[in-house]
A protein has these predicted regions:
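Surface-exposed, charge/polar-rich loops and edge strands
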Residues: 1-150
Length: 150
């Protein structure tokens, strides 16, 4: 691979509270197809598991969140690192309550723009609403797996 083609993406993989689009917190940009959502709903209902994160963008004016993530990344080696020869992934685990709270505060009031995963996000909303209608509560059903990047 030509080193000139290298790219680096810094993201935060986390759970995000499901928000109805009308609330203006999580914003879509494309239409979705019913058949694809039905497939995903059946899978989520059967497994109660997010297999793939929603990829979302946020604005980090001033770069505070990015700097926080870089600082966390530089405090220890990655927990997981793997490569297929072309793409390398490195994952760090953040379990420091102070760091987690700082990141939560960074994202409070910030809009998230779905770049990839509209069908999965809408499926998460439907699943959450179905459980609410049944009076059922499952830990995590109010959240969805998301990767956030600026």
């Amino acid at each position: 691979m030509d080193r000139g083609d290298c790219r680096s993406v810094l993201g935060l993989v986390c759970r995000v509270r499901l928000e109805d689009f009308a609330n203006g917190v999580v914003l879509p940009h494309e239409e979705t197809l019913s058949k694809a959502k039905e497939d995903r709903f059946q899978l989520l209902s059967a497994t109660r598991c997010n297999f793939s994160s929603i990829y979302s963008l946020y604005r980090d004016e001033g770069g505070l969140t990015r700097q926080r993530l870089l600082n966390l990344k530089n405090t220890c080696p990655p927990r997981y690192a793997f490569s297929d020869g072309l793409v390398t992934h490195r994952l760090w685990v953040v379990n420091d309550p102070v760091a987690i709270q700082a990141l939560r505060e960074d994202f409070a009031g910030r809009k998230l723009y779905i770049a990839d995963g509209h069908h999965r996000y809408e499926t998460g909303l439907r699943y959450r609403d179905a459980l609410r209608e049944q009076g059922a509560y499952l830990p995590g059903s109010e959240y969805i797996l998301m990767t956030l990047t600026d």
